[in-house]
Amino acid sequence: MIVKIEESWKEVLNNEFNKEYFKKLVKFIKHEYKTKNGKIFPPPKLIFNAFNSLPFKDIKVVIIGQDPYHGKNQANGLAFSVDSEIKIPPSLQNIFKEIEKSLKIKTIPNGDLKRWAIQGVFLINTILTVEEGKPSSHKGIGWEIFTDEVIKIISKNLKNIVFMLWGNLARSKKKLIDPSKHLILETSHPSPYSVNNGFLGSNHFINTLDYLKKHNKNKINFQ
């Protein structure tokens, strides 16, 4: 696995790529892809899709997921996203439901969130790879160290970013974010198991658009 990442990200993350934990992580992931016969997701070229879809300085919103979808052909390197021909997973269905209800718009009926990413939404999982049918199978191998650093770098070097933290894991990242510089929105995960614990009716998307407008940033179309 060679880290092929957009130039502005390479600049801010170069130190991280040279750390010992990251070198061990790369070695482990290479071995996984080589020996697990297509059962590691997403495909290698899409591991850093969230980074390659959005230059660092263009970030407006950060949405933090857990680890990639573990079903075949689902994960595409963007948190909560699937390719357009893939059935929309339940969590993303609930995200669309909240958008439609709160913003009074009709969402596009496909789950490819690249359309959000190119507008400034950084869709990052805390763990960037997974084995088929085994959620959290790549937990604790180094991805969390890396993505924590990514969140800290965004918080430190940018300003007036909206961070959407859904569920306990994402909310645990609050400590990495400077609340004096950014808007932090917290609620339950959009999973069917927890969507009614605050996610539906949270108005996160309304709050996000209001904040972007207040800070003279271009509106994001969440359709």
From Swiss-Prot:
Subcellular localization, as worded in the UniProt entry: Cytoplasm
Protein name: Uracil-DNA glycosylase
GO cellular component terms listed in the entry, alphabetical order: cytoplasm
Class of enzymatic activity (EC top level): hydrolase
Cysteine-cysteine disulfides: none
Superkingdom assignment: Bacteria
Entry annotation: catalytic residues: 67
SUPFAM superfamilies for the chain: Uracil-DNA glycosylase-like
EC number: 3.2.2.27
Described purpose of this protein according to its UniProt entry: Excises uracil residues from the DNA which can arise as a result of misincorporation of dUMP residues by DNA polymerase or due to deamination of cytosine.
Entries under InterPro entries matching the protein: UDG_fam1, Ura-DNA_Glyclase_AS, Uracil-DNA_glycosylase-like, Uracil-DNA_glycosylase-like_sf
Family in the record: Belongs to the uracil-DNA glycosylase (UDG) superfamily. UNG family.
